[in-house]
Each structure stands twice: as structure tokens, then as C-alpha cells.
Amino acid sequence: MAVGGAGSSRSVAPCCCCAVLLAAALLFSAPATTEAYDALDPNGNITIKWDVMSWTPDGYVAVVTMFNYQQFRHIQAPGWQLGWTWAKKEVIWSMVGAQTTEQGDCSKFKGGTPHCCKKDPTVVDLLPGTPYNMQIANCCKAGVINTFNQDPSNAASSFQISVGLAGTTNKTVKLPKNFTLKAPGPGYTCGRAMIVRPTKFFTGDGRRATQALMTWNVTCTYSQFLAQKTPSCCVSLSSFYNDTIVNCPTCSCGCQNNGTSPGSCVNENSPYLQSAIDGPGKWTGQPLVQCTSHMCPIRIHWHVKLNYKEYWRVKITITNFNYRMNYTQWNLVAQHPNFNNITQLFSFNYKPLTPYGSKINDTAMFWGVKFYNDLLMQAGPLGNAQSELLLRKDSKDFTFDKGWAFPHRVYFNGDNCVMPPPDAYPWLPNASPLTKQPLTLSVLVFSIVLATLLAYA
């Protein structure tokens, strides 16, 4: 037995080594984190376009434009921060429509002082109300960029930059590298700058086109995994066929007794509510949410409201629990297998998303109607938005059983919301054939016994 045990240990050792080597190979051959990916928006990205418009004695003047090609993810306040590393010893002489966060060490310049001398500058947008002589088209929105789906007129942000100590021809210019984008926090990964065909610009009447002297693009993609954000929304559920209201999971976005952030919530009926809202955090943008079991700034409630012969109705309510923030141009994305049969929608805009191809239409984007409910007010009596959906039943798939009527996934403003566990969903009342069988059998037995007794009576 001892010999057999030793032999088995010797035979296992090579297998273990092989397993370790295989695991290491898989680890090092895995895709790099630069391949950011969002399952509901696989082709979404932020494209940064540099158009060199003119050459200067020691460099060039370029217009930099950021396009938000994401389906549903805005760049929200406090806005984007764009960074890069210069390839040589370039400096920024001046900027229009944006500014760097630091000037850096410009002590070697005896004459005019550059706007920024840092090797790795960080650029931010200017605020609304900036003087006209410091503006350029599509600038000065505090770094906020909406999506093309929802607001195409505000889906880009631009600034002009004058670069010195740089190349002065297409062949001598060295492209910046190591691009970073915070919008406003982490989550975006940017690729290398790639030279593309020069951008063309058309006159107002469309009869003449000019073009940039040189153009390069940088593509940045988003990943929830890289962002590692604390959840900011949660989902609760209810239905007409079950009295159970499934609340957001406890501590979905935090816990009330979290000692690391004291004073981060206030009770709805607290006499100190207004003083808490006007406290020091008001000017820093620090959230102040209503004290709840879930502690989320946003709750989405999905209520299965009515059942008709050929249709069924759902009510969606979005509630803001943040006393210090309202949400402009908010949007909601949800997944449900019956979204391909949406018949009517009340008080929300709607667009189907097809992340898996045109044959699968189970993802929908909703947003508010302009001047009606596109602004989700801060917590309080007006801090909610509601809509109802009328959906046609699909005879092949439709059922109220096993939580089918509830969404698989919900996003608010691009953030994945915390869902209740599936076993907590409101289910149909227990009426399966198995539960009726004992009652039916007992009645049958009683009938047979009664018939037998009557026969011998």
C-alpha cells in the first residue's frame, strides 16, 4: 500500500505542473485590459479627433473634438478630463475652449510664457458663460457630453490648442501617446493615436469643402469592471398577482451605519433636513441621500400592473433619493424578452437597442420627454418620473410564471443597477397540478367508498 501511495504521488506531480503551466499560459495570453467592453453597447466608444488646421513657426494649431458614440452613457458633471504624454518636448502655447489643470515648470522661457509646459498635461472643459473670445464651437459645457441617441446636438465637445516645440510638417509631427480619459471617474481605456484621412469641412451652402492638414484619432472604450464604481441605483419589483413587494436588496449602494461616510444620509421627516442639504457638502457635490435600507440615490420600481387577453401592462417609476442632485437628460436601459412587442408607451421616449444583432430585440432605452420629464428633480415630492408600457403577448414565450415578467437587467445613466435575487421575485400563487392532486384523489376515493356502501345498503 505504501509503494502504491508513493507511485500515485509521483504520477500526480507532473499533472499538477502541467495544470500550473496551463493556468499561467492562459493568464498571460488573456486579452489586455485595454480591450474594454460593455455587453449592452459593444460598439460604443468616445472618439477623440485631432485636426491640424495650420502650421506655426515652431509647431501647429489643432482643433480637438471628442465625439460620444456610446448608446446610453453620457459624460456627466463634473465632466471629462483628457490627458496624454507628449512624444518630445512639446509645450502648449495657448488654448481656446479648454484649459490645462496645471501650468507646470515654464522657467526656461524668457519671453512669452506658455499655457502649459508639463510633459503629461491634463485638459478640462471651460464652464458655461465663458467670454466669447475664449470660446470655440461645441466648447464650454463643463465637460458634459450627451449621447447621439438622446441628444445629438450636444454629443460632442471641442477645443483649440496651439502646440510649440513640435514638428511643422506631416512628416515631422510626433503623435502624443498614453492617452487617458476620465469621464468624470475611471473606466475608460484609450488606444494609440492613429493617423487617418484628413477631416473635410463643408461651407454652410455645401458648395465648397476644405480639409485639415493632418488628422489622427484616439478611441476610448468603457468597462464597468475597470470603473469599479459603487452601485448608484437599485431595482424593486411588484405585481398585481402577488401582494409581495420586493424591495431593493439591503445595502445595495451602502449601509446607514457606515462609519466611513458619516452624515451621508438624512431622514425624510427630519427637522434638520434643510440645514443638512445646505451643509458644507452642497458646494462640493457630495451626495446626500434619504436614509433607506438600500442607500441608493436612484431606485427603479417595476410593477406588473394589468393583464389583458392579448396584452399586458407594466408601470415603471424612477425615484431620486439624492437631495443634492437632479438628473438632466437621464436615461434608463432595461432587458426583457418581450420588448420586441412594445405596442404603446406613455410619457417616455423609447428606442430599441440591438447589441446582439437585429434578430434579437430584447433591450430598450427610455428617456424623458423634453420640457416635461427630461429633468429628474432632486429628492422630494417632484423627484420621480413614471411611465407605463403596453406590450403584446407572444403566445410562444409569454408567462407570468417564475418571474418572467420582470427585467433581466437595468441600467440608469449607464450604471448597472442592483437587482433583487431571482428567488425573491413575486411568483404566481401556487396552483400547480401537483398541489391539486391529493384533493382530487381524496374526492375520488370518497366517491368510490360511498358508492360501495350504497351498493350494499
Curated annotation (Swiss-Prot):
Disulfide bonds: none annotated. A lipid is attached at N430 (GPI-anchor amidated asparagine). GO terms for biological process: cellulose microfibril organization; plant-type cell wall cellulose biosynthetic process. The chain crosses the membrane at residues 437-457. Its main location: membrane. Keywords: Cell membrane, Glycoprotein, GPI-anchor, Lipoprotein, Membrane, Signal, Transmembrane, Transmembrane helix. It is found in: Cell membrane. Residues 1-35 form the signal peptide. Glycans are attached at N45, N170, N178, N217, N242, N258, N326, N341, N361. Residues 431-457 form a propeptide. It is a lipid-anchor; GPI-anchor. One of its GO terms (cellular component) is side of membrane. InterPro entries: COB_C (IPR056900), COBRA_pln (IPR006918). The keyword RNA-binding does not apply. Involved in determining the orientation of cell expansion, probably by playing an important role in cellulose deposition. May act by recruiting cellulose synthesizing complexes to discrete positions on the cell surface. Belongs to the COBRA family. This is COBRA-like protein 3. It comes from Oryza sativa subsp. japonica.
